[in-house]
Amino acid sequence: MNPPKSAPDAQGLSYRDAGVDIDAGDALVDKIKPFAKKTLRDGVLGGIGGFGALFEVPKKYKEPVLVSGTDGVGTKLKLAFHLNKHDTVGQDLVAMSVNDILVQGAEPLFFLDYFACGKLDVDTAATVVKGIAQGCELSGCALIGGETAEMPGMYPDGEYDLAGFAVGAVEKSKIIDGSTIAEGDVVLGLASSGIHSNGFSLVRKIIERANPDLSADFHGRSLADALMAPTRIYVKPLLALMQKIAVKGMAHITGGGLVENIPRVLREGLTAELDQKAWPLPPLFKWLQEHGGVADAEMHRVFNCGIGMAVIVSAADADAAVSDLTAAGEQVWKIGTVRASREGEAQTVVV
């Protein structure tokens, strides 16, 4: 069978002609290696660039249980594209996964990321990965690998998507699953740094309606910077707290807000009653509620409303927990208590 004939003057095609620049990918790897190197920790075997990433579970664990979590940044990325601001979304990516595995008592060990785009901009991608590495440093886990996918025609120019996953370990006997939570326990709320990475489809709709000047001053910084503030990472202060106090349950306040995330750690028959006057609603959430005409119930169901992590401890341990977390740099409030559920009542109510 004869091969098909090409046009007389046609030149051979390359991958670059198809929109994939292998050299740009190699340049990115060279740029991000120093960022990843700063995240190295005990357990990492080998460096970036292998087919698989190797990690040895620390010997301090007698019966280690691996805990994994995966997530993205959601439509917060659309705002990042609009603002051409790419230095914070990497921390968002890490925070969403490490905070999730933390709630079961896990120490984050390593993280891998996936960066997908239509055309690779090396500087933009490097800025994003630098943020990922900074998030890994804040959570004490190693950035041990990742994937950069340049896929022509899949994404609009200047846009990309992010995904990542974290793996951690917890001693089998110390898994936190909420099973010891009882009536009378106290719910502590740790302050969020802002909107974090959930609810941005509604945020963008409010911005579209209000049409604000995003560069205008908003309580000492631009409104854009307030909206894009990276998700707070709670790993180090909470791991330290677990060494001193019996933490009974934790809830990372993500999509679904306080009212849908706290029930995930409560046994049937228990309700967390939260006092919305126990902590201040940050100005950014007031702005969103006012300009979007968003009802209180919807705010609590969509946004973190100033609380990024809920921690449940016994009443006897509550003051010590607040003191320790405050000393570690966290803002903490006693935001509620656990009680028996009333018939037909939700497992988290805000009063």
UniProtKB/Swiss-Prot annotation:
One of its GO terms (biological process) is adenine biosynthetic process. It is an enzyme of class 6 (ligase). It catalyses: 2-formamido-N(1)-(5-O-phospho-beta-D-ribosyl)acetamidine + ATP = 5-amino-1-(5-phospho-beta-D-ribosyl)imidazole + ADP + phosphate + H(+). Its EC number is 6.3.3.1. Pfam families: AIRS (PF00586), AIRS_C (PF02769). The keyword Nucleotide-binding applies. One of its GO terms (cellular component) is cytosol. Its main location: cytoplasm. It comes from the Bacteria. Pathway: Purine metabolism; IMP biosynthesis via de novo pathway; 5-amino-1-(5-phospho-D-ribosyl)imidazole from N(2)-formyl-N(1)-(5-phospho-D-ribosyl)glycinamide: step 2/2. GO terms for molecular function: ATP binding; phosphoribosylamine-glycine ligase activity; phosphoribosylformylglycinamidine cyclo-ligase activity. It is found in: Cytoplasm. Keywords: ATP-binding, Cytoplasm, Ligase, Nucleotide-binding, Purine biosynthesis. Belongs to the AIR synthase family. This is Phosphoribosylformylglycinamidine cyclo-ligase. It comes from Burkholderia multivorans (strain ATCC 17616 / 249).
